[in-house]
Amino acid sequence: MISTLASLVKSFFGKVPKEDATPPAGDAAFAQAIALHQQGALDRAETLYAKALATEPCHFGALSMLGVLCYQTNRAQRAVELLARAVAIDPVQPGTHSNLALALNAVGRGRDAVESCDRAIAIDPACVEAYSNRGNSLWGLGRRDEALESYARALAFDPDHAQTHWNEGFLRLQLGQFDAGWPKQEWRWHLPHLAASRRPFTQPLWLGKEDVAGRTLLVHAEQGLGDTIQFCRYAKLVAALGARVVLEVQPPLKGLLANLEGVNQLVARGEPLPPFDLHTPLMSLPLALGTKLDAIPSESAYVRCDPDAILRWREKLGPSTLPRIGLVWQGTADNKSVPLAQMLGLVSPVAQFFSFQQGVSVADQALLDSHPEIRQDAAGLHNFADAPLLALMDLVISVDTSVAHLAGAMGKATWVPLPYNPDWRWLLEREDCPWYPGMRLFRQPAPEDWGCVITQVRKEITARFG
């Protein structure tokens, strides 16, 4: 449910402005800010937007586009404040209402976001961005059928609106409609922030139609580390078709995936590539191989750590009469994260607890240090060097992070607390996870309600180990 800069700028101007276009206010600082914004120089653009506002506090364009910039840089509440001021100055600009909806949705005000989109549509009944953003907001509220209707309206006005196709694809996947969802994921290459990272290979793209037997297929990772851990399982399936598989992964994963079955050669991104005949982005393999909900390749343990490394950790930890439980509470998005103070509610004498949290905030570190019963052996370990320690856990409790994927891929018993509207891969309602047989999902019954989730998980810990 992401909007690109081009879409955001387009919804403000009515079209993506050229660098030599004169902005509505004709202000020099604003004009420079827009050019820098589109070039990705966000710090410099922000400085110039602020300069324009210092000169003219009610500068509609600067308020609007600084709001967009704040949204892009994960300052959604500030974006709401700026865009709301812009709307108050000029309430008849549909793009500004639509952008405000994005920011409102990001701070959990989904109903207000829908209303903002409705105002944009009332001004311009053909506002594609507003229909698309309305779909995102409705999806976040759990009104998925209405979201699909809004996406359909957006695509009726613009059949090539890549952002809408991509978002609808995620929703279809969350609904388990894989036949419709996987093809729409290919629209990602029409999004500016992803198109720029598309690999310019001269070898043909393979999406499952050509025979790969006897040919070398380069499978190259994309997007996040968790995505790579989840989808690297497909290497084995491609190898079963007779292909020689070269897998390119992010550098932190090279050591971890060194023994992945089905891979003839593993390389880290940035290393020289061997000769190959065809290539496939890793996230396109489910489409290429026709993955269906009832036939997800779900081998229980396809990522295996070095046995010697596990032995070294076992000796370091020493014997324990208690089960070991690993904890991760902070994800990349606030709505995926459980506050540490609440996560500590799981700690009890029935088990020995270990923190596997990376990038601990100063406040969380102080709180963590006040609980010596939680071991911090994994602190300071990077590039998945803590995987052998993770292998010694009897249970891993992790929010939606790469650690959850790693534990699942290692076949560990893994419990995942999920937000009310989770990422597509966790589907809906079910407690099990078809991607990872050893995983159990604990879902929020209502937005932001981690209390019920923690209470349930604590009861299950007691039932399992108490």
Each PLM stretch: what is its role?
Residues 1-395, 400-466:
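Alpha-helical solenoid repeat scaffolds of the TPR/TPR-like class and their adjacent stem/linker regions
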